[in-house]
UniProtKB/Swiss-Prot annotation:
HAMAP family (alphabetical): TIM_B
Organism from which the protein derives: Geobacter metallireducens (strain ATCC 53774 / DSM 7210 / GS-15)
Recorded GO MF terms: triose-phosphate isomerase activity
Protein's UniProt name: Triosephosphate isomerase
UniProt keyword annotations, A-Z: Cytoplasm, Gluconeogenesis, Glycolysis, Isomerase
EC number of the protein: 5.3.1.1
Active-site residue numbers: 95 (electrophile), 167 (proton acceptor)
InterPro entries reported in the protein's UniProt record: Aldolase_TIM, TIM_sf, TrioseP_Isoase_bac/euk, Triosephosphate_isomerase, Triosephosphate_isomerase_AS
Chain's role: Involved in the gluconeogenesis. Catalyzes stereospecifically the conversion of dihydroxyacetone phosphate (DHAP) to D-glyceraldehyde-3-phosphate (G3P).
Catalytic activity: D-glyceraldehyde 3-phosphate = dihydroxyacetone phosphate
CC per GO annotation: cytosol
Localisation: Cytoplasm
Keyword Methyltransferase: no
Length: 251
């Protein structure tokens, strides 16, 4: 049985006071939810403050990125070990915005994933196709390449620390959402590829999240699909009531 994960990616939003106010609002909404793993990913500068705010509740902390070296002359970077020290249990790696704006490649994603696993973090590994790639009927080709390259060199045991997040780039922040059926087809393909690269048993246990304009209004239909194990939520994770409603999609 794969435990669902609802993860909120705050992107470049919420200073310290805003983050703490959000957590204070969210906790009462989700504190009785025991059958869903809840993760929030604030900006680096508020990680420690948010960790203190969620210390006694069922919410876990993620960063939005990391570097592949643990320390050194790498100005502006944050290492996986530093994220653990700040209280993180998870880290998002390979988000489409990192790929689009900051030169992230499959190679750098792979290096970051290996470093994060070594530090003990659970990785939310993002993959997904652009609109042009989908219209050129290259969705499966793109997903397979991203999975093969991103997970290259990982041992089977490492997959216990991997959660895959499928984010069709054309549906991020656009208000467009893949239909439940489109999302399920992509998720089933991702699970198939993981089975081919590792084992069918690993593929059956790995959790695959959907990310692409997830809202309270569409989360239940997505979560009813057999290969969708959760959501990586963007805009709707910035308001406690909407994120709480997504977390409590079973209610």
């Amino acid at each position: 049985m794969r435990t669902p994960i609802i993860a909120g990616n705050w992107k470049l939003f919420k200073k310290s006071s805003e983050a703490q106010d959000f957590v204070a609002e969210l906790i009462p909404l989700v504190q009785k939810t025991t059958d869903v793993e809840i993760v929030i990913a604030p900006v680096f500068t508020v990680l420690s403050a948010v960790k203190r705010a969620i210390a006694d509740c069922n919410i876990m902390l993620s960063a939005q990125d990391c570097f592949w070296e643990e320390e050194g002359a790498f100005t502006g970077e944050i290492s996986p070990g530093m994220l653990v020290d700040a209280g993180c249990s998870h880290v998002i790696i390979g988000h489409s915005e990192r790929r689009q704006y900051f030169g992230e490649t499959d190679e750098t994603v792979n290096r970051k994933i290996k470093a994060a696993i070594t530090a003990g973090l659970t990785v939310l590994f993002c993959i997904g196709e652009t609109l042009a790639e989908r219209e050129a009927d290259k969705t499966f080709e793109v997903l397979r390449t991203q999975i093969e390259n991103g997970l290259a060199g990982l041992a089977r045991g490492d997959l216990a620390k991997i959660v895959i997040a499928y984010e069709p780039v054309w549906a991020i922040g656009t208000g467009k959402t893949a239909t439940d059926e489109q999302a399920q087809i992509a998720h089933a393909f991702i699970r198939k590829v993981v089975g081919e690269l590792f084992t069918v048993q690993i593929a059956e246990t790995i959790r695959i999240l959907y990310g692409g304009s997830v809202k309270p209004e569409n989360v239940r239909g997505l979560m009813n699909q057999p290969d969708i194990d959760g959501a990586l939520v963007g805009g709707a994770s910035l308001k406690a009531d909407s994120f709480g409603a997504i977390v409590n999609y079973k209610a």
